[in-house]
Amino acid sequence: MSIRRLPEATVARLPVYLRVLAEATEGTISSEHLAAGAGVNAAQVRKDLSHLGSYGTRGVGYDVAYLVRQINRQLGLTADRRVAIVGIGNLGHALARYGGFATRGFRVVAAFDVDPSTVGQQVGGVLVEPFERLAEVIEGKGVELALLTTPAASAQAAADALVAAGVNSILNFAPARVAAPPHVAVRQVDLGVELQILCYYGLQAAAGLTAYDAVDAAGS
């Protein structure tokens, strides 16, 4: 199966569908059931899954195991992905200890920091290495993805080091945008911005719109 180019909003919903499918108790699932668990409507589910070439069977629904395989292949989750965390402050500590990564096909295998008092610690079962060893450890452990949780001032230098070491995907939690070459995927996660967006949807909810209605009205 080739990797299809999907709308960004559809990509964002696929992991939610996976979560609902993981909780399914039968071998098939209807678009209505999948929609209820994902917080969207059934028409949206059918549209999203049609992008994968999956149309279900009228009166039966979707084969759960097959749909899980389709979504995992589209997301590149057919095997465990090795992850590194750069910056072991409060957020880095929390992410290193988060147990939900493993259940979704991600394994944190490396952690890095510049603080001598943090280097050498075990966090979430992973040894914190000095930043100077980043390239060596990344290559040795086959890391493909990185979580960037450094201060803003050092985020770009850390991203540059990750790219040079061969990391091809970066999830940036630092409060500063980082640049990377076209062959490297970067997603920026600014928690302050997320709170601002949440405030907007809070106003919509207070006005009587559901979260889905608010998103739909915004053109997603």
Question: Can you describe what each PLM-predicted range is?
Answer:
Residues 88:
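Glycine-rich Rossmann-fold phosphate-binding loop(s) that bind the pyrophosphate
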Residues 99-103, 162-165:
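Short, solvent-exposed amphipathic alpha-helical segments in soluble enzyme
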Residues 91:
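Hydrophobic/small residue at the entry helix of a nucleotide-binding pocket
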Residues 102-126:
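NAD(P)-binding Rossmann-fold cofactor-contacting core
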Residues 28, 32-83:
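HTH-adjacent hinge/linker in prokaryotic transcriptional regulators
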Residues 1-27:
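Extreme N-terminal segment that seeds HTH/winged-HTH DNA-binding domains in transcriptional regulators
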Residues 17-26, 126-220:
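Phosphate-bearing ligand-interacting subdomains
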